[in-house]
């Protein structure tokens, strides 16, 4: 394996960590209605658990509510049950044609808890990025030991890997900071 491959693998792992962080943070709710909040809801559609977005149209008429219009009125009850079973803490209002969801206001205490949760998720992402760096540096040391690359090339590769690591940690911090700001903003 060449140094370029080691760098590429490390960068791919870090990229994957950043994407994973973004997905994880989508699940942490802010005080505003965002369609991504409902991504985890699975509806029993003719015996098959299907994502809510595939069985209904989801819109946000205002910042604090959802309007869910199923493609088939027959599955309205199933959608309602799926929402109740989810851990969103929202009570669906079924009028026979559509379901309305009100996003409850977050208390100050809940906002702080969510901000702590964001920090914890971000720290896990930082650790994953550092582990990718460590794995890459171990590969470089192995290449040096096997005399596949010179010591100077190894040092340069480690410096490049460190630079990529620093960039990804900055990106992780930026994503987490944006989410925290969204949570703490009333």
UniProtKB/Swiss-Prot annotation:
Protein name (record): Ribosome-recycling factor
Function as written in the Swiss-Prot or TrEMBL entry: Responsible for the release of ribosomes from messenger RNA at the termination of protein biosynthesis. May increase the efficiency of translation by recycling ribosomes from one round of translation to another.
Keywords: Cytoplasm, Protein biosynthesis
GO CC annotation terms, alphabetical: cytoplasm
Keyword Cell membrane: no
Alphabetized GO MF terms: ribosomal large subunit binding
Intrachain disulfide bonds: none
Location of this chain's protein in the cell: Cytoplasm
Record family assignment: Belongs to the RRF family.
GO BP annotations, alphabetical order: translational termination
Annotated source species: Bdellovibrio bacteriovorus (strain ATCC 15356 / DSM 50701 / NCIMB 9529 / HD100)
Gene3D superfamilies: 3.30.1360.40, Ribosome-recycling factor
Annotated region (Disordered), positions in chain: 135-156
CDD domains: RRF (cd00520)
Pfam annotation, one family: RRF
């Amino acid at each position: 394996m060449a140094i370029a491959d080691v760098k590429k693998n490390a960068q791919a792992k870090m990229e994957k960590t950043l994407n994973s962080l973004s997905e994880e943070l989508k699940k942490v709710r802010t005080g505003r209605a965002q369609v991504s909040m409902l991504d985890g809801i699975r509806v029993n559609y003719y015996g098959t658990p299907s994502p809510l977005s595939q069985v209904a149209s989801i819109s946000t008429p205002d910042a604090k509510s959802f309007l869910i219009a199923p493609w088939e009125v027959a599955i309205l009850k199933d959608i309602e049950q799926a929402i109740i079973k989810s851990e969103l803490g929202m009570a669906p209002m079924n009028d026979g044609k559509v379901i309305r969801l009100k996003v409850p206001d977050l208390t100050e205490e809940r906002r702080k808890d969510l901000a702590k949760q964001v920090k914890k998720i971000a720290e896990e992402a930082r650790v994953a990025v550092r582990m990718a760096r460590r794995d890459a540096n171990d590969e470089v040391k192995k290449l040096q030991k096997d005399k596949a690359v010179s010591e100077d090339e190894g040092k340069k590769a480690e410096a490049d890997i460190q630079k990529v690591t620093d960039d990804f940690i900055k990106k992780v911090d930026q994503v987490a900071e944006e989410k925290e700001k969204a949570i703490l903003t009333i």
